[in-house]
Amino acid sequence: GHQWFDFINKFEPQQEDFYPDRSDVWTIIFTSGTTGTPKGVVLDYQTNENTECLTTPEHNPLRVDFNGKNSFFSYLPLNHIAERIVVEWTCFRYGGTISFTESIETFAQNLGSVQPTVFFGVPRIYTKFQMGILSKFPQEKLNKLLSIPIVSSLLKMVLKKKLGLSKAKAIVTGAAPMQESQRVWYRNLGVNITNGYGMTENCAICTQLPGEITDKPDSVGKAQPEVDI
């Protein structure tokens, strides 16, 4: 390997454009072993090209701004397929900024200051958010406040900003099951969580259930473009 500055000083920038074959290796991602022994999953440029079909003006589950006005918050391991696609690849492909959490202790503070337009969280993160809200607003009290129109609107606005989701156009979960009751709970706060299903082997996303749909318990949504089931 090379240190970054040694790499810059030792190698000249590539002058000509590089056009890989679709069968060339795009990246290798090592899995945690969910489906067996941990292994390096080889993804080629054809897979990457298919991923691009998931974000078009007609089909845009991440609500990406094609003019590059996107903001992402990175906290998962960078070799996690969801982090690689939803945050890294999407930002590199369509433009935007990526902000990184400083530590576990500063996660909430960092997210609150960034207010990303796209946020991906595993279900455990949303459970922690929920527990934090309920520690200050027990469910009975929360229900009462949400039943008062003016108070409800103000409370939803305050909570979304406190969570760091006030500017989020897409709020997504995946990598583990999320209970439908939890998605409904968040929807009552004005937070629509899109549920995605995928694996490292199929480049993160093969189905997705839009956040506004909460009447299909146990569903992971419809197959995405270029996905065969």
Language-model features, listed with the residues they occupy:
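Alpha-helix/helix-capping structural signal
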Residues: Q46, R124-T127, A176-P177, S181
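ANL superfamily adenylate-forming
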Residues: G1-R22, L134-K162
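Conserved AMP-binding A3 loop
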Residues: W26-C53
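Conserved AMP-binding/adenylate-forming
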Residues: F119, L155-I229
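Conserved AMP-binding/adenylation subdomain of ANL enzymes
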Residues: E49-S74, L78-V158, K167
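Conserved pre-ATP/AMP-binding loop-to-beta segment of ANL
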Residues: F11-F30, T37, R63-S71
